[in-house]
């Protein structure tokens, strides 16, 4: 098992998330591994392979979007607060980006809720609507990098040029930083703390890890499209189009 940890070793000022919460992925190789029979669930039942994979589609992609909702919420909250600190909240282009971020978050939330509401019960287990949850995951994944761009644009270049914790603690530098980096209604330190939070989510190795997760975790974009294609009942729409066009339904 080869482990890959994401998030630099650092302090909670510069890395407010990864300094406290590590994300770990592994490359796991099973080479001549003995599996106890009580842990063997399929043994030649090839007809069950499809339903097993489908269960991944229905449940795992539901969790995929569900656990991303707090992330898109912090995009909205951090961007709004940073716009206040930067003194640009009244700018039309900033409000435009904030409205798009809000829409992104709420569409992801609404589609996830609807997938739960449209669940079917199988053997006493609620199964999310596969079509709707794949649409939710597809929307989240295909718009994630654009959302990052909106957040970065509102925050500004201090995401990568901001001072370190050591700089802020230096008596000779602290006065200059307080003078030039303080914001409307905010101290320089608080503004930098918020900037570092946004940087951690949009401009670090941890952010890159999250961006790859958005595309590939719990199923790739093409896998989601394939599921939507297979799950959607297009026949009623085809019949409706025929009726409006005056085409006989043979």
Regions found by a protein language model. Give the residues of each.
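Extended amphipathic alpha-helical segments enriched in small hydrophobics
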Residues: 63-121
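Intrinsically disordered or highly flexible coil/loop and linker segments, enriched in small
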Residues: 39-40, 88-91, 107-114, 118-121, ...
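Alpha-helix capping/hinge segments and adjacent helical runs
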Residues: 131-250
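FAD-binding core of flavoproteins
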Residues: 1-67, 229-250
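Short, charged, amphipathic alpha-helical segments
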Residues: 95-99, 127-134
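Generic structural signal for well-ordered, non-membrane alpha-helical segments
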Residues: 23, 65-68, 72, 105, ...
């Amino acid at each position: 098992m080869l482990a890959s940890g994401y998030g630099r070793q650092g302090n909670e000022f510069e890395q407010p998330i990864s300094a406290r919460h590590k994300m770990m992925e592994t490359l796991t190789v099973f080479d001549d591994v003995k599996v106890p029979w009580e842990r063997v669930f399929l043994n030649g039942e090839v007809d069950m392979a499809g339903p097993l994979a489908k269960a991944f589609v229905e449940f795992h992609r539901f969790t995929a979007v569900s656990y991303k909702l707090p992330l898109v919420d912090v995009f909205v909250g951090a961007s709004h607060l940073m716009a206040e600190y930067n003194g640009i909240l009244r700018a039309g282009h900033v409000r435009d980006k904030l409205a798009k971020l809000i829409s992104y978050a709420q569409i992801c939330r609404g589609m996830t809720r609807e997938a739960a509401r449209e669940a079917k019960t199988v053997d006493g287990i609620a199964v999310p609507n596969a079509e709707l949850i794949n649409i939710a995951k597809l929307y989240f994944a295909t718009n994630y990098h654009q959302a990052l761009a909106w957040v970065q644009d509102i925050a500004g270049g201090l995401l990568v040029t901001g001072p370190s914790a050591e700089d802020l603690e230096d008596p000779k530098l602290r006065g200059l930083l307080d003078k030039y980096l303080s914001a409307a209604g905010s101290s320089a330190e608080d503004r930098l703390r918020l900037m570092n939070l946004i940087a951690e989510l949009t401009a670090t190795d941890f952010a890159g890890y999250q961006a790859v997760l958005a595309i590939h975790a719990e199923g790739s974009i093409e896998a989601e499209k394939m599921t939507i294609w297979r799950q959607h009942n297009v026949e009623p729409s085809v019949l409706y189009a025929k009726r409006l066009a005056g085409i006989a339904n043979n």
